[in-house]
């Protein structure tokens, strides 16, 4: 299986997703469309991972539109897609649903609560990394998967085809450090009231990698 990853900033890498590809014997290729505008084709993609980034799906950029064209092709072909943050927003927008300002800006560690049992054996609550101020509307094709105290629409699942999460399960400790070092000023105005130092002081929950494995296994089994 060829897993193609769309990465949108140097400081938001695949983290535990790469660990999963290695453990499952998948081939992983990373693309940086924001740099050169180059994307994989649908034919050379068995699974697509769309990571986060500082841009918005509403930005009028050709490569962002080309990403959605690829997502549309893969959804039509029933090939699995996983999106984190901006990536989840891209899936929702591809399906015709709005991406807009969130009622609250969330940056830092905070719990999310599971809202669906479509995917077996997920924890009822998880401590995850938030890094966003926009949100998606839940597609009619999908089930609400996660919510938080500040935001209902934290995640969705289109059964066996796509998962979109507004937050991040995938960062390992090095990924968190890269996000904070390169984008620590983004914590200003967050309702979570965490400083960059607070974020770095919180250990990455080991169960988050386990959850990444369960989510990606669900999409590919």
Enumerate the language-model features and the residues they cover.
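Short glycine-/acidic-enriched loop or helix-start segments at secondary-structure transitions
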Residues: 15-16, 59-61, 92-94, 140, ...
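Catalytic nucleophile loop
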Residues: 74-98
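Amide-donor transfer/coupling interface in amidating biosynthetic enzymes
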Residues: 5, 100, 115-221
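Short gly/ser/thr-rich secondary-structure transition/capping motifs
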Residues: 27-35, 111, 128, 145-148
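Short, solvent-exposed loop/turn segments at secondary-structure boundaries
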Residues: 59-63, 103, 123
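Nucleotide donor/acceptor-binding cores
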Residues: 1, 46, 126
């Amino acid at each position: 299986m060829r897993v193609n990853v769309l990465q949108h900033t140097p400081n938001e890498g695949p983290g535990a997703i790469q660990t999963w590809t290695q453990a499952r014997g998948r081939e992983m290729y990373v693309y940086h469309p924001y740099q050169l505008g180059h994307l994989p084709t649908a034919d050379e993609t068995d699974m697509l991972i769309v990571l986060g980034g500082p841009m918005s799906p509403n930005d009028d950029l050709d490569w962002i539109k080309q990403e959605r064209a690829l997502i549309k092709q893969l959804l039509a072909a029933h090939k699995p897609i996983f999106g984190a943050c901006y990536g989840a927003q891209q899936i929702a927008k591809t399906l015709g649903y709005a991406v807009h300002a969130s009622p609250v800006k969330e940056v830092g560690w905070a719990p999310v609560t599971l809202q669906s049992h479509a995917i077996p054996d997920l924890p009822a609550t998880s401590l995850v990394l938030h890094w966003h101020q926009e949100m998606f509307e839940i597609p009619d094709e999908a089930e609400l998967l996660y919510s938080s105290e500040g935001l209902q629409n934290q995640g969705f699942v289109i059964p066996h085809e796509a998962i979109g999460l507004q937050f991040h399960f995938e960062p390992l400790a090095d990924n968190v450090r890269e996000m904070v070092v390169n984008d620590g000023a983004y914590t200003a105005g967050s309702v979570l009231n965490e400083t960059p130092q607070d974020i770095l002081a919180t250990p990455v929950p080991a169960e988050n990698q386990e959850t990444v494995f369960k989510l990606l296994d669900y999409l590919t089994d």
